[in-house]
């Protein structure tokens, strides 16, 4: 069986419960120092709620890098074309120390960036507690950008949405090329199944034909059961 790459795009739509969204994102992104393929990678936040939501995230444990700190991260992120192994799976405070910042309280690092350069490394799976943060004009732009990003890396995997709009959820289901949409839940603890949703619990998530997978659901024991189909005329 083939399983696709994770690169989870999280959309915060303007009707979202911001306290729930902020708590869930920090909980999800900091879990196991963001080594899960279902860990939040990019946050797309609507302009109308952007400043307010960044403040909520900061209150929950986000450290948003300034331009000088972003340049320092850019300089140490790669070694010989690959992610610096000294940073992978390390907690936020350790990464910040390497940027000259002493902060033991932060759980997640935010890298604010525009959507003009989608080839930038922060738009890809990173395996450390750093999130790309992007301001979008509206929910339609968010869906278009989310699809563009997942089609570059993470096609067919998953997308997270924080919203109270059933209309937007339905639209996302029609527009997104992903096998699962995780609604109002900590993504890394939910995409692989949890007590709070009906998904089968697994570490192997199918990505469908989008991601060149054999399955588009969570791998389960039933996938290994042989079945005999009795066919009568």
Mark where each language-model region is.
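ALDH superfamily catalytic-core signature
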Residues: 1-117
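Conserved C-terminal structural/oligomerization subdomain of aldehyde/semialdehyde dehydrogenase
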Residues: 101-233
């Amino acid at each position: 069986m083939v399983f696709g790459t994770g690169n989870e795009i999280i959309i915060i739509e303007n009707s979202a419960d911001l306290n729930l969204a902020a708590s869930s994102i920090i909980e999800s992104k900091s879990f196991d120092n963001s080594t899960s393929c279902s860990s939040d990678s990019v946050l797309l936040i609507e302009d109308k709620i952007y400043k307010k939501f960044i403040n909520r995230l900061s209150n929950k444990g986000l450290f948003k890098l300034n331009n000088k700190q972003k340049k320092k991260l850019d300089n140490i992120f790669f070694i010989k074309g690959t992610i610096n192994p000294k940073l992978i799976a390390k907690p936020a405070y350790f990464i910040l120390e390497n940027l000259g910042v002493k902060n033991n309280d932060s759980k997640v690092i935010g890298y604010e960036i525009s959507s003009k350069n989608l080839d930038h490394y922060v738009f890809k799976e990173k395996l450390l507690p750093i999130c790309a943060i992007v301001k979008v004009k509206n929910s339609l732009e968010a869906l278009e950008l989310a699809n563009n990003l997942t089609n570059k890396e993470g096609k067919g995997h998953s997308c997270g949405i924080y919203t109270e709009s059933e209309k937007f959820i339905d639209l996302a289901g029609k527009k997104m090329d992903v096998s699962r949409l995780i609604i109002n839940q900590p993504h890394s603890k939910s995409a692989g199944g949890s007590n709070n949703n009906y998904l089968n619990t697994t570490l192997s998530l199918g990505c469908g034909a989008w991601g060149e997978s054999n399955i588009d659901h969570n791998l389960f024991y039933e996938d290994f059961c042989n079945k005999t189909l009795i066919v009568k005329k």
